[in-house]
Amino acid sequence: MSPLSAARAALRVYAVGAAVILAQLLRRCRGGFLEPVFPPRPDRVAIVTGGTDGIGYSTAKHLARLGMHVIIAGNNDSKAKQVVSKIKEETLNDKVEFLYCDLASMTSIRQFVQKFKMKKIPLHVLINNAGVMMVPQRKTRDGFEEHFGLNYLGHFLLTNLLLDTLKESGSPGHSARVVTVSSATHYVAELNMDDLQSSACYSPHAAYAQSKLALVLFTYHLQRLLAAEGSHVTANVVDPGVVNTDVYKHVFWATRLAKKLLGWLLFKTPDEGAWTSIYAAVTPELEGVGGHYLYNEKETKSLHVTYNQKLQQQLWSKSCEMTGVLDVTL
């Protein structure tokens, strides 16, 4: 990617962000975001990645409030004990715990899955929520560009390693669910199969958007595989909107200033940002339904290229090669 292309990528990302913020402002002026009513889900088990902060924390808290056994997967050991205690206190649910998982390390992901499976409990909901946003160019422990490696590839590996447990846990009328958090930036993203690591000319904006596009393609292909084998597991992808969290530390200074001064008005709260993830995880309306892109608890169209099954397959096969996952679609 040339410097000019990198500049264009930044402009496109900020343009789509501004459009989402404007839509949120208009909705707030018309009455705001009303909290959906979610059914209780006792005796269900959920894993939430990135559950110590922001949208992930709100998601974990609300699932615990619904009676679920919630396992927070994260790499913030120092904050974990406080977060777990707070959620238990607020929800009166003692079935909340933390397991260390660094999504930037395949070794850590595999260790997390091993520890989880040693518990001998089912898994009904996996929420792929964790991520980084527009960070400077750097690599994961396995040598992947961080947006691609953590946001996308880490969740690709985690999901595949947990699929057997999800399949065992799902049943007719009570499907297990994979919920993956993408973003509106995928609408302005490009997937460069020849340079997934953004090594030619790094743009944090393009790299972030590409990782979110990859998550949509991954979800759609995963759903096709699950449906083809008749398993009682569904996969959907959600867009939380522009949410007032701490992930904006690397964005343009004007965006940080707007967030600081007007975030309360222009941005969704973390709870509001979590509602679509929770909806996808528990609503009876989506029982047995997968392959949807959800925004504000409603299905909407994703970028046209995400429906390209050949591209889905290419990314899936490449991801299997990168992670050592067996490509069953070959």
Swiss-Prot record:
Effect of mutating V181F: In CDG1DD; likely pathogenic
Subcellular location(s) of the protein: Lipid droplet; Secreted
Active site: Y208
Top EC class for this record: oxidoreductase
Chief localization: other
GO molecular function, a single term: dolichal reductase [NAD(P)+] activity
GO BP field: dolichol biosynthetic process; positive regulation of autophagy
Keywords recorded for this protein, A-Z: Congenital disorder of glycosylation, Disease variant, Lipid droplet, NAD, NADP, Oxidoreductase, Secreted
EC numbers: 1.1.1.441
Substrates-to-products reaction catalysed: a di-trans,poly-cis-polyprenol + NAD(+) = a di-trans,poly-cis-polyprenal + NADH + H(+); a di-trans,poly-cis-polyprenol + NADP(+) = a di-trans,poly-cis-polyprenal + NADPH + H(+); a di-trans,poly-cis-dolichol + NADP(+) = a di-trans,poly-cis-dolichal + NADPH + H(+); a di-trans,poly-cis-dolichol + NAD(+) = a di-trans,poly-cis-dolichal + NADH + H(+)
Pathway: Protein modification; protein glycosylation
List of residues binding NAD(+): I55, Y208, K212, T245
Tissue: Widely expressed. Highly expressed in the pancreas.
Outcome when changing T49M: In CDG1DD; uncertain significance
Oxidoreductase in keyword set: yes
Any one Gene Ontology cellular component term annotated for this protein: lipid droplet
Disease involvement: Congenital disorder of glycosylation 1DD: A form of congenital disorder of glycosylation, a multisystem disorder caused by a defect in glycoprotein biosynthesis and characterized by under-glycosylated serum glycoproteins. Congenital disorders of glycosylation result in a wide variety of clinical features, such as defects in the nervous system development, psychomotor retardation, dysmorphic features, hypotonia, coagulation disorders, and immunodeficiency.
PANTHER family assigned to the protein according to its UniProt record, in alphabetical order: DEHYDROGENASE_REDUCTASE SDR FAMILY MEMBER ON CHROMOSOME X (PTHR24320:SF264), RETINOL DEHYDROGENASE (PTHR24320)
Other known facts: The gene coding for this protein is located in the pseudoautosomal region 1 (PAR1) of X and Y chromosomes.
Functional note: Oxidoreductase that plays a key role in early steps of protein N-linked glycosylation by mediating two non-consecutive steps in dolichol biosynthesis. Acts both as a NAD(+)-dependent dehydrogenase and as a NADPH-dependent reductase during the conversion of polyprenol into dolichol. First catalyzes the NAD(+)-dependent dehydrogenation of polyprenol into polyprenal; polyprenal is then reduced into dolichal by SRD5A3. It then catalyzes the NADPH-dependent reduction of dolichal into dolichol. May also acts as a positive regulator of starvation-induced autophagy.
Family: Belongs to the short-chain dehydrogenases/reductases (SDR) family.
Annotated protein name in UniProt: Polyprenol dehydrogenase
Species in which this protein is naturally found: Homo sapiens
